[in-house]
Amino acid sequence: YLYIETHINAYYNPSLASSADAVKTVVSNNINAYADSSEMNKYGARFKYSRFQAIVDNSNQSITSNITKVEIRRDLKPALNQNAEYELCFGNPFYIRNNNGYNIKSSGFNIFGIADTVYLSDVPNNNSKNSKYGSLFLFKLQARQDPIVISANVGTIDYEKGEILIKPINIIGTSKKVQKISIIE
């Protein structure tokens, strides 16, 4: 599954709404109805950002605009304790926010031979926002915001196609579990 997570800031005219909670409730209800609709839950369905924003804007006459941040993710169920390669296809382009990397990030996991929890991230080739491709690397956190690269070139990323290819890696554990199954987000 492709998971879509949104962070919405809806702006509204308070004189046209009974309360902020009323606006929040109707926006939430409309988003949930859209998420549950056949438009979003059929094979080959596409998330349309402009359609989503229109649903938010049209939820209540008091809403004047919205700024919505969208994040997409896939849950990877790794083959534990064995070398395996992975391909994750998102079907949506990745935005290069930072030429120096860290545009995508995984949840934590453990690999054979490294005692620390590691994370997967990227760096665009040529350090350019116009780059179509990038490489993947593993890093650990020395402190809360102090990443240290553990291993470079562990895979590739195609920013235009939204595809991630991870070279053979021996994952021995993950920081996240869903119904007792180890996953990497």
Regions found by a protein language model. Give the residues of each.
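Acidic, low-complexity glycine/serine/threonine-rich segments
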Residues: 1-87, 160
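Generic serine detector
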Residues: 15-19, 28, 37-38, 50, ...
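Surface-exposed interaction regions enriched in Ser/Thr/Asp/Glu
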Residues: 132-133, 140-185
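Hydrophobic beta-strand residues in large extracellular and virion-surface proteins
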Residues: 118-120, 136, 164
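Polar low-complexity, Ser/Thr/Gly/Ala/Asp/Asn-rich disordered segments used for subunit assembly
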Residues: 62-64, 73-122, 126-130, 172, ...
